[in-house]
Each structure stands twice: as C-alpha cells, then as structure tokens.
C-alpha cells in the first residue's frame, strides 16, 4: 500500500565501531481509526504497532488521571506458537509488565494531572529479531503515537538503552553484545527549552557477567562517576529520537482536541482550610511514628469538615467532600516541602542525609534454607531463600533474550504491611517491578553455575512499609542468601533517595533526601533507588513527577546514596560476614561428568535407567547436554551413592569370575533369572543354581523362589566371548549350570548306527513283553485311515479335556496302558541292569498306571532331567512330533 497518506521519519543512531541502528516511525498504514497509530521499526527487522486512544467522556468520579499502558506480546512475532493449552496468548508475561512500567513512567507526568478522560496506550509486538529487545522501541513508539493523537501531551519523550561494552556506551545493544556489558542503562528524557535533555526515567543495572569482566578482564568499574557519564552519553541519542518524533508531529499530527479538566479544589476552599488547619497540621507533621501521625491528621481533617459544614453551600455534598480532601492533602504537601526547602527539616526530625535506625537478624524462620529480617525505621522486610536443583530454574517463553532464569526474586507486599485491608493473591504490576529491581541488584554478585550449581528462589515479604521496601528487600535478601550458604561475591545494599524542588527567594533549588519516608515519597518530586556493593553500582531506578531532572542533580544524588549504602553494608557485615553453613534441610548437590556418548546409557530407554537410579537412591539427577550431571539429595549420602552408580555406567567395570555381588532380579524366565550386577550389566542365574536356594529341591517355576525386584547374592562363574555372564549361588560355583550331554558317537543315519531294528538283540529279561518282531510294513502299505498324527504333542491337561475313548488308546498301545510319556534321555543299559528292582513290580506298576509326578526308573534322575529340559527349551522351541505306529498281529 503506497500513497501520500503514509508518512514516515527516521532516526539514525551512530555507535561508531559498533555500527549504526535505524529507528523508523511510520503512520497512516495501520490502525487508521485510533486517535494515534505509529508503526516503529528497528533496522526494518523488528516492528511494533503503537496506538493511543482517549475516551469520549471524562470519569468525573475519578480523582486521578486514568492512563493505561498495555503491551501485547504476539508469539508469531518470534515465529512461535503459544505453549498454553489453548495455543493462544493469555495474561501478560513478566517481561511485558516490565515493559509497560518503562513506558508508563515517563509518559504519565507529561499529561495534565487533572485530565479525567481514560487514555489507553497499546503496544503490539508484530515482529522481533531474537537478538534485539523490544521494550525501548515500544517506549519511543508510544510517545510518537501519543504525539499525533490530538491529546494534551507535553512530549515528545524518548528513550534509549545503553550498554557499557569495552569502555564504550553502545545504544540499542543486541543481546549477543550485552553478554560483554559491564553496565546497562535505560534512560528516558525530553528536550527542554534551553536545548538540554531533562531525565524523566532511569532503569539500570550491572551486567550479569560484570564481576568477571571487572575483576578478571580489567573492564571499567561502574561506580557513581561512570554511571553519571552514562546519563550524559544518553542525551545525544535522546535528542535525535525526539527530533524525529517532532518532525512526525509536524507532518501527521491531528489537531489538539479540547478536553475538560477537573481542578482538584478551588482556590477559596484551599485558603480557608489553610487558615483553619495550618498550625495543627504543622504540629502533626512533626510526629515521627507513622500510625500516630496518621491518626492525628485524620482528627484534624474531621475537624475541618465540621467547621466547613455550614460554608460553601453552593457545592454538592459529594463534590465538597472530594475537594476538601484534595485541598487538605495539598496543604500537607506544601507544609512538608516548604520546611525541607527552607529549614532542611524533615517529618521525623532527621537531617537531609540521615538514615533511620537499622537492624538486621538472620535465621529467624525454622526449617527454611535461609532467612533474615531487615528493618529500617518502620520498614520491615522478611527475606527467605530456597535452594534446589538446576532443573527447577524458571523457563521463560520470551520473544527474545534469555529463555531461563536461575535466580528468581519474588517481592510481595500484603495489605497489612500498611495497616490496611485489601486483595491478597496474584502479584500486581508494582510487586513484579519491585521484585525485578531487587533481582537486578543481586544477579551480578551471585556465584556461577559451576561454583554453586543450585537454582535459587528468593522471596521478599514486605511485612511493614514506610518507605523504600524495594531497597529493604535488597538488604534482607543479601542477609538471607548468606544465611543459606550462598557464596555471594560481595554483599549488596540499597537506599532510596528523594528530591524536593521549588523556588526560594526567586531561585529554583533542589534538595536531595536520603532514606525517604512514605510521606516524603508521596509529597516529593523523585524516587531514586540505588543499590550496589561497596565498590560499584548494581541497580538503579528513577521515577519522577517532574517533566525532567537535570543530570548534575542526579549525579550529586548518586554520591549521596553511596554514603548511605556504605553505612548499611557495615550493619550487614556485623550481622553476617560471609556465607554460613548450609541448612541440614537444604539439598546437597554434587556434580560429575560423563562422556557425551554415554548420556543415553545413563538415561536409559524412555528414562528407565535414570528413573531407576533415582528410585533406588532417593537422589534427584539432572543431566546437561555437555555431559555434566547434577545430583542432589538431602544430607548428601544418597547423592554420593547415585554418583557412584553413574560413574559405573560411564566407566563400566566388567565383572570377572569369582566376584561376588548383591544383585537385583530384573527378569525371570523358564530357565533362570537375570540379575543386575552393576548399572547396565546383567548376568544369568540358571534354574539349576536357583534350586540351591530351595535346599536343592526340585522347583516347578523360577518365580517360586525368585521374583523380580528380589535381591540375591551371586558369584560370577564366568564370562563367555560374547560378554554373557553366568552366575552361581555362593558355595555352588563348581556345579554346572546345565546337564552335560554325553557323547552319542557317529550316528551314521537317523537310527544312530545301531543296525536294523530286527537285528537288534533284545535282553532275555524282556521276553515276557508283548513285542512283535515281525518286519514292519512300508508306510504306503498301511491303511489310509491309520491313526497317525504329526501335530505337536499336546500337554496332558489338554489331551484329557478331549472327548475320546481312552480304551482305544490303551488297546493300540499294547501293554503301555495310559502311562504318561517321558521324553527324558534313557540311561545306558548297564545302568539299568545295575538297578536292584523286581521286574514283576515294574509290570504291575504299569498295570496300575502312573501318576503325573511318578518318575520312571529306567530314565535319568530328576535333577538331570530338569537340567536337560531347561537346556532343551533354551536351545530350541521347535514343536516335537509324536509318531504312533500300530502292528498287525496276523501278518507273517
């Protein structure tokens, strides 16, 4: 789509040796019905659509400006499908919420605070380069769309992210470049009348690799002077982007609309309240304790309402109450600010640089891995640390940037912390922002994964609030982490700075406050939070109610904050000067390495091996792609056992004959049991050996003695050429695992070389048997209906179920009756002759018939039969043929 309605401007960011970045603003193509719509492009590679829309009617019952900023992360922007059940975007991520705060903070002060029409700014991420962050681009797009929307907006305001890389401040750094950043800073500002840039918002922190870069590679340390230099370095980039937005406004802006403004109070009402309550408020605002001060102020306010009950009768009651409240609050604000500007006198009587009473304590919560309580005045923070396996680190489904987070900092502020009631549940935007700031302050001093292979969750409970709970969270977290045994590279402390500005004797002056109260935050012009070690800054955040603050004032505030930070660090070091012994309830994590090609063996098919190790030892195991294995358990003994098993898999020991093992039965078969000796190594315990566990008695099934999961002591009999391991019961090593087959000689043909059947000599002791020695007929001469069956022999139980006449079978078998057939190998004739038994008894036994469990004495002994049968089943499962032959007694 092309045409004169599409208008665009560009801002070129020159980073010298790091190249140029181009920021382009385009309007007229997309979202044409919004009050203001701008598509912002970074190098024509990342694209964000920003829209600004105002409500048609004001919300008269509101006593604040209703501005809403939303960031819509579209997963298609990164070529992804959402991972949720419904496969669509849901609630905003933490990254989106932090981006909303970065946009809201510099935009809000530039609107009239008496505007009551709803204003909504929506940032839709349409495309993003995985190596770029979108938040600062969205900030500039939001300002541009608001500039052309026709709203009363004192812009433009623009922002830039700078990274200190190899001594140079680089604008709009890529994620890959930020790996070598010592310090990162997001600065938003606007160009004032004298051409200078006034700072409106700062969000900054040391890089995650800052400690290594500073102390191992000698990079620049981000102290107060360096950070102040970063603020100055941001000004040229801010000015270039503001100029591009101003040009876009000239060519594409709508005419500014007229919006009704709602003054908070009338001048007459304010003067009357000042006359009635000034002296009482001046006294009440000198009470140091928060709750008694609030109670006294409430009494004064009720007295003012009673006094004015008969005055200003032309106003409706609801409107009158609202204006009285607004005017009364403004009077408090003026009293507090005037005393600071003219007398350097604060609410609780402190000087401008004084810190409230500090206290620190560790190990106050039982059983948790680490805990601490930090208190500064009436601000009270409980820090709790939890350690776990690296596999518990947070996985982030982000459009770009890091996809996981090992250190997770959660900030929570329940309503009782201020003596109020309210909703308790999911975190609000403010809580997410405070947690992210505290996390940013501590990440640079955390040990590396190799030094401390734990996932760390830190929770800051703001159980008492009267100013700067976020910086109190940094202090409490330092104490808690050290109490949990986390080897921090240095302790970190934080302090909140305030600012009051105004005209005194015709001169505009600024007063910087150290360790501000909640009331000073509400009535002041700035909330400037600074955290760091004794040597450099690790985190920085600035919010202001002014259009902008001179950079030299901020530089002075940084130096003042360092003094306070040093004092707090002394208190922390007195409480705990290093990492404590880890809690007995914390997991002990050890590491080992396995060759990459052995990872599959450690995991096993479908995770069978690793799950078995975890089940047997009680340890938890996590394996990295490079072969690093992390093993954890409470107490450490289970972890050591699991490590030993994993090492055996990675460097297996081949069992040798004579070695004894306590193995677990992993499988049973009809011929024996497979026993696990070492991880991944099994051996066969033959059924003939298993009988020794049953006192040598015959067993019908292996499961009668051993079942899967049983533990049995075995000794290695031998290992064949294929690596197959045969096992034995200790004490029976010399016993063969199967009956040996005797030498049957050269069998010549299927008859075994014993000559013709009719020529064989029969023993005289068999003359009384009903045998027929006449020549057999050829098979073709036999009757076609002969009872001949070459099917596999059925089990006896199957045959008995058949409906046939057993008498016919007996008659065809001659004197064999219904004897159970036995296919065991026959003994040699000499063995049978040596037996001392009565042949008549044998015949009578045949006539009586034999039971299933009877053993025919002319066959091998029971134990040899069992061995032969097991060996035969192991070698072959071919069906056995039974051939039935009948003889004609009348044939010559």
Swiss-Prot record:
KH domain location is 587-646
GO term, biological process aspect, one: mRNA catabolic process
Residues binding Mg(2+), per UniProt: 521, 527
Keywords (A to Z) from UniProt: Cytoplasm, Magnesium, Metal-binding, Nucleotidyltransferase, RNA-binding, Transferase
List its EC numbers: 2.7.7.8
Q: Map out region (Disordered) in residue numbers.
A: 407-427, 727-892
Give the matching SUPFAM superfamilies: Eukaryotic type KH-domain (KH-domain type I) (SSF54791), Nucleic acid-binding proteins (SSF50249), Polynucleotide phosphorylase/guanosine pentaphosphate synthase (PNPase/GPSI), domain 3 (SSF46915), Ribonuclease PH domain 2-like (SSF55666), Ribosomal protein S5 domain 2-like (SSF54211)
Q: So what does this thing catalyse?
A: RNA(n+1) + phosphate = RNA(n) + a ribonucleoside 5'-diphosphate
Molecular function in Gene Ontology: 3'-5'-RNA exonuclease activity; magnesium ion binding; polyribonucleotide nucleotidyltransferase activity; RNA binding
Location comes to: Cytoplasm
- Is Transferase among the key words of this record? yes
**Enzyme class, one word?**
transferase
InterPro entries on file: ExoRNase_PH_dom1, ExoRNase_PH_dom2_sf, GPSI/PNP, KH_dom, KH_dom_type_1, KH_dom_type_1_sf, NA-bd_OB-fold, PNPase
Database matches in Pfam families: KH_1 (PF00013), PNPase (PF03726), RNase_PH (PF01138), S1 (PF00575)
Could you name the Gene Ontology cellular component terms for this entry?
cytosol
Question: Which cofactor(s) are needed, names only?
Answer: Mg(2+)
**Basic and acidic residues compositional bias, start-end:** 739-844, 851-877
Q: Residue limits of the S1 motif domain? A: 658-730
**Stated family:** Belongs to the polyribonucleotide nucleotidyltransferase family.
Question: What's the stated role of this polypeptide?
Answer: Involved in mRNA degradation. Catalyzes the phosphorolysis of single-stranded polyribonucleotides processively in the 3'- to 5'-direction.
Q: What is the protein name given in its UniProt record? A: Polyribonucleotide nucleotidyltransferase
Q: Lineage of the native species?
A: Bacteria, Bacillati, Actinomycetota, Actinomycetes, Bifidobacteriales
Gene designation per UniProt: pnp
